[in-house]
Amino acid sequence: MDQDACTHSAALILAAGKGTRMCSNKPKVLHTLLGEPLLFHVISALRPLFGSNIWVVIGHGSSLIQSICSDLSLNFIYQEKQLGTANAVSIALPVLQQSRIKRLMVINGDMPLITSDLLECIIKKSDKTDFVFATLKLPLPNDYGRILRREGKIYSIIEAKDIEPSLQHDTTVEVNAGLYYFSLEVVDKCLPMIKNENKSQEYYFTDIIELAVENGYLVDSIYFEEDWHFLGVNTPKDLSYVESIQQAFIIEKLLQSGVIIHSPESVRISPFATIEPGVEIYGPCEIYGASYIASGSIIYSHSWIKNTTISHDVCIYSFCHLDTVIIKDKCSIGPYARLRPGCHLEEQVCIGNFVEIKKTQLGKHVKINHLSYIGDAIVGDESNIGAGTITCNYDGENKHHTFIGKKAFIGSNTALVAPLTIGEKSLIGAGSVIIRDVPENMVSIARGKQKNFSKRK
């Protein structure tokens, strides 16, 4: 889409519904698919085509939706009463007109398998029409609205609840996919004519098709053979099914690109993750968010990774939990390690079993091999942190920082009470509780004097 078209076109996501059949108080569009809300998947498909011209109609759980989407540069429109899809569009219309939008795409917020390429096909189809929408042919139409044609031309859509009994058992019929792109002029004229004279007593946006045809507008459709792109989520079963389709597609694409995946049926990978050819993954494993894994790295089973950048030749052993971390080349993590948000590991860092790290920078060749907690710290190159080392970073009110210089050696079972600085090449004796700064090249021991007593006979 060219810049001018992008400026005067917009997308409207319908996300105000309660999603009653999900049996949850959470807004339906916030239920997650492969670690991300359904709404995020739709936004991801729209963003390359519409930029910041994306409006979301919200109602149930509106404050929660706005909070979770606060960093996404979206425009929100509140629908107080959910009176139907036409009502949602009518509420948005004045805002869109004020923003000088000329063409609008309307899409449901629960269609996570939609793609930018597919949306672009619909936009291109609209060049010679006033209103275009997507259709499918399904052997079991279920809840989909039926397309009615007269002499081959579309003239109406009938929603599933209002279909005559004689048509209920039709085999393989053309249905509405729930995706529209049109001139705002059509909506401005025809939307006020829509009535709620149907079994649901709702204002159906699909009624605009018949009204547009009657008023002389050019209405057309684009048929898609692959119906799975348009699958919506209405129930927990739907969510599970859609997720399985998305996962199978992602796994197949990665396998073809050269990623080695053992037990692929037990591996879950976000569509927003990037994994280079030459990576090896053992299932079960979960990789979410905008994670990036470079070639040569190995991810062993039962690892959970989110929004993490893993460079070349890194080994993540089993049962590791990595959240928003940067890991440079040739590091070794785990097993049973937890790296929390804000960690940055330079090249060839070794993190062993039962180690937790939070908001910490580790220099090159740092070793933390066993049973330690390092939080709010900076550790210099080639330092060694002994087993059982704890940075005592919280005083009950505030967090404090620990600075450990290059080539320092921290003995086992040491408590470092922050704020604290350990100088370069210093050595801390095992079992110490360090409460004051230690200068460079010093040995510091802070523990009780050992006393031996004879055993009683």
Curated annotation (Swiss-Prot):
The active site is at 370 (proton acceptor). Acetyl-CoA binds at residues 387, 393-394, 412, 430, 447. Signal peptide: none annotated. Its cofactor is Mg(2+). Pathway: Nucleotide-sugar biosynthesis; UDP-N-acetyl-alpha-D-glucosamine biosynthesis; N-acetyl-alpha-D-glucosamine 1-phosphate from alpha-D-glucosamine 6-phosphate (route II): step 2/2; Nucleotide-sugar biosynthesis; UDP-N-acetyl-alpha-D-glucosamine biosynthesis; UDP-N-acetyl-alpha-D-glucosamine from N-acetyl-alpha-D-glucosamine 1-phosphate: step 1/1; Bacterial outer membrane biogenesis; LPS lipid A biosynthesis. Gene3D superfamilies: Hexapeptide repeat proteins, Spore Coat Polysaccharide Biosynthesis Protein SpsA, Chain A. This is Bifunctional protein GlmU. It comes from Lawsonia intracellularis (strain PHE/MN1-00). It is found in: Cytoplasm.
